[in-house]
Amino acid sequence: MPVSVGSYGQQAQPSCFDRVKMGFMMGFAVGMAAGAMFGTFSCLRIGMRGRELMGGVGKTMMQSGGTFGTFMAIGMGIRC
């Protein structure tokens, strides 16, 4: 059966900005997960409890998420 040539079924490719944005979001999610594990371990190891523990873990999650997200965004930008 011949294949139709029309534009039906073809999807537009994402723009370079969309790819960089997606790379940042994926990297941020992975960095947050890693930050939750490492932050919890390091905060419990030094004896943090309660509100101090939540603040320390949250700070570590945001830092690692932002760092890894930035590197993933740069990597996706290079691939554009």
UniProtKB/Swiss-Prot annotation:
Region named Sufficient for antibacterial activity: 42-60
TM spans (from-to): 22-44
Record GO cellular component, one term: mitochondrion
Cellular location(s): Mitochondrion inner membrane
Domain of life: Eukaryota
Function: Has antibacterial activity against a variety of bacteria including S.aureus, P.aeruginosa and M.tuberculosis. Acts by inducing bacterial membrane breakage.
Name under which the protein is recorded: Reactive oxygen species modulator 1
Membrane topology: Single-pass membrane protein
Main location: mitochondrion
GO biological process: cellular response to reactive oxygen species; defense response to bacterium; positive regulation of reactive oxygen species metabolic process; protein import into mitochondrial matrix; protein insertion into mitochondrial inner membrane; replicative senescence
Homology family: Belongs to the MGR2 family.
Stored SMART domains: Romo1
Keyword entries, A-Z: Antibiotic, Antimicrobial, Membrane, Mitochondrion, Mitochondrion inner membrane, Transmembrane, Transmembrane helix
